[in-house]
UniProtKB/Swiss-Prot annotation:
Entry-linked PANTHER family: FORK HEAD DOMAIN-CONTAINING PROTEIN FD3-RELATED, FORKHEAD BOX PROTEIN
Compartment(s) where it occurs, according to its Swiss-Prot or TrEMBL record: Nucleus
Tissues expressing this chain: Expressed in ventral body wall muscle. Expressed in the structural cells and two neurons of each ray in the male tail.
Gene assigned in the entry: unc-130
Protein name: Forkhead box protein unc-130
Keywords, comma-separated and alphabetical: DNA-binding, Nucleus, Transcription, Transcription regulation
Segments of skewed composition (Low complexity): 307-333
Length: 333
């Protein structure tokens, strides 16, 4: 049996197996790396399509809720909207209420401005050529009892003149002021059997001829209370002379005769004060207000009070005087 060297060598040499190929592992790694890239590339159109579908569905649901009057529960970002809508509704209602209040205030201002402008707007009737004093006197003289209240005077003027009817009540305060400031009008109190609101007003008996021959267009003279009323008051005064007489005031006739000495109940408060009555002399027509001011200015001041320093000096000097007098008494003894 023949053996060749090649067969012997081949039998003695170990058979070498080829190393395992790593290509499948590399392909697996490539697939692992490439799969997310392919997924992300494919997921982008899918996500955009899903977002579009979500927007379309949200828009349709929102339109349906608006048509049905319901409010959406979520916003575009998925945030609940119901509370925000409630807050917006409350703020809108508060704004509406404030606007309503502002409208009401505007209406009130308009009404007050209309009332205030009623006295300034032009009237279709001409203004009567009478003063307020003439109107008041006219109404009082045309009344049966010759006395009227403020409301009755205004009622007479309104019924008599259309001009004042349109301007009422803008001129009512003028009537009130003329009644209280003019001496020709006298206030008459209501009797016990005549209850009601407000006093009566009448003309002073001395000013009935204030207007010429019953014409109220012009007053003949301006009525003013005379100062003779003061002399009449003094003539009926219980005391023979008033407590204070101003300088320039004449003696009443009753002071010309001598008066009896009035007994005093106690010592005078200021015995050093000697009454120094100046020479009295006169204006005939003197106003009552001026008279009162003159009487107040002529009150004689009292003696000035002694200061504390003088009191101290007098008190300190008194013991010295007593001591000196005691010494002189001893020496004389």
């Amino acid at each position: 049996m023949l053996f060749s060297m090649e067969s012997i060598l081949s039998s003695t040499k170990p058979k070498l197996e080829p190393p395992p190929k790593l290509e499948p592992e590399v392909t697996i790694n490539e697939q692992v790396v490439d799969l997310p890239r392919s997924n992300t590339r494919l997921s982008e159109p899918s996500t955009s399509a899903s977002v579009l579908e979500h927007d379309l569905k949200f828009g349709e649901s929102r339109k349906r809720s608006r048509s049905l009057g319901d409010e959406p529960t979520e916003d575009e970002d998925g945030v609940p909207v119901r509370k925000a809508n409630k807050r917006n509704h409350s703020t809108s209602s508060a704004a509406d209420s404030s606007s309503d209040d502002a409208k009401d205030d505007d209406d009130d201002d308009d009404s007050t401005s209309r009332k205030s402008m009623s006295g300034h707007r032009k009237s279709s009737h001409a203004k009567p050529p009478y003063s307020y004093i003439a109107l008041i006197a006219m109404s009082i003289l045309n009344s049966p009892e010759k006395k009227l209240t403020l409301s009755e005077i205004c009622e007479f003027i309104i019924n008599k003149f259309e001009y004042y009817k349109e301007k009422f009540p803008a001129w009512q305060n003028s009537i009130r002021h003329n009644l209280s400031l003019n001496d020709c009008f006298v206030k008459v109190a209501r009797g016990p059997g005549n209850p009601g609101k407000g006093n009566y007003w009448a003309l002073d008996p001395n000013c009935e001829d204030m207007f010429d021959n019953g014409s109220f267009l012009r007053r003949r003279k301006r009525y003013k209370k005379n100062s003779d009323t003061y002399h009449e008051m003094m003539s009926h005064h219980p005391m023979p002379f008033p407590p204070f007489l101003p300088q320039g005031m004449p003696f009443p006739p009753r002071m010309m005769h001598p008066m009896a000495n009035i007994p005093m109940l106690g010592h005078p408060m200021n015995p050093r004060a000697v009454p120094n009555m100046p020479a009295f002399f006169i204006p005939q027509n003197i106003d009552s207000q001026k008279l009162l001011s003159m009487m107040a200015s002529r009150i004689m001041p009292m003696d000035a009070p002694v200061s504390s320093g003088q009191k101290r000096t007098s008190s300190s000097s008194s013991p010295n005087e007593n001591g000196s007098s005691a010494v002189s008494d001893k020496l004389s003894a």
